[in-house]
Amino acid sequence: MHNELIIREYKSSDKQAILNLLRLNTPGCFSPQEESDLVYFLENEIEYYFVLELGTQTVGSGGFNFSPDKTTGIISWDILHPDFQRKSLGSILLNHRIEKIREFKDVQTVIVRTSQLSYRFYEKQGFTLIEIVEDYWAPGFHLYKMAYTRWP
């Protein structure tokens, strides 16, 4: 099938495709300054990161990390190609990661750190806003910290 949806683990050879996804979402969802943060994450901080493919096209990516004590799962770097937003693919990718986090029995909560531009998506997925920090990511890009309410 040409339009088979696959979620697989990130490989270093995916880096350019992921950066291209970020650029397609800049400045609509991300600040231009965040590209260097993503590069650093992909090269140094990655714990679990996934690529969403539709057929042969990379249409999304996202991962998760843990707090130092391993009791909090942290959803990280959700990026979806603009042409594939609002088609449930972001929900599929998020749910995949939440199910993966459930495999870690020490996790007591799941959070996401997003912006005012994307927090409504997470609200619809069961996250509740717990903190706002203005201009956190860059001027005009505020931090919206949210906790998952459907845990465990």
Task: Label every model-predicted segment.
Residues 47-51, 61, 77, 111, ...:
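Short hydrophobic/aromatic beta-strand element in the GNAT-like acyltransferase core
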Residues 66-76, 85, 104, 140-142:
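A conserved beta-turn-beta hairpin within the catalytic core of GNAT-like acetyltransferases
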Residues 1-33, 53, 58:
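Short amphipathic alpha-helix that is part of the acyltransferase structural core
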Residues 51, 57-66, 72-79:
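Conserved beta-strand in the GNAT
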Residues 80, 86-99:
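Conserved acetyl-CoA-binding loop-helix of GNAT-fold acetyltransferases
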Residues 11, 67, 81, 113-115:
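Residue-level recognition of the GNAT/N-acetyltransferase active site
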Residues 28-51, 63:
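Active-site rim helix/loop that mediates acceptor-substrate recognition in acyltransferases
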Residues 109-113, 123, 128-145:
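Conserved catalytic-core motifs of GNAT/GCN5-like acyltransferases
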